[in-house]
Regions:
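A helix-centric hydrophobic-segment signal that preferentially recognizes long
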Residues: 1-159
Length: 159
């Protein structure tokens, strides 16, 4: 009868590990989705900050780029790619502006928030992608059930 107790203990341990793995993988994927939403909000906030300066000299191109950023949703893969290109164009245009104390602080703060949100999102996506290769996650085929999180390929706005 002792072998039955050992068998029950092994099954319980494997079941607990499987439950822990599923919970961890799902939690990391949920965090990646949440951080992507936060990144999109910070990118929208930066575009709105740029739109405050409509009519200022030298801001015509940057305002047009900010409008194109706001106009592109990120729901499909193609829209996401277009949004990445638009964000990169906006970042490059903002770098080319000569800083003016009237608006430089607002844009620097918005860029820092975007950079922080981008870094957090990248970290969560990295962790979620790594969790998909855990042996128990592969055995339970979690990589088929959960969509693979995607990195945002945007330039660092703080450089």
């Amino acid at each position: 009868m002792w072998w039955l107790a050992v068998l029950v203990a092994i099954v319980a341990a494997v079941g607990a590990y499987a439950t822990w793995t599923v919970t961890r993988v799902e939690r990391l994927h949920r965090r990646a989705r949440t951080s992507e939403s936060a990144l999109l909000n910070k990118l929208d906030d930066r575009a709105e900050t740029v739109l405050k300066f409509v009519g200022q000299p030298g801001f015509d191109e940057v305002v047009a780029l900010a409008l194109s950023v706001v106009a592109v949703p990120a729901e499909t893969q193609r829209q996401r790619e277009l949004r990445e290109y638009a964000e990169n164009d906006l970042t490059r245009a903002l770098r080319e502006l000569h800083p003016d104390p009237a608006w430089a602080d607002d844009l620097e703060a918005a860029n820092r928030r975007v950079a922080l949100a981008r870094q957090i999102h990248t970290d969560f996506v990295r962790d979620a992608v790594a969790s998909r290769s855990l042996p128990m996650a592969v055995l339970l085929r979690l990589h088929h059930r959960l969509p693979r999180p995607q990195y945002w390929d945007i330039e660092d706005p703080v450089q």
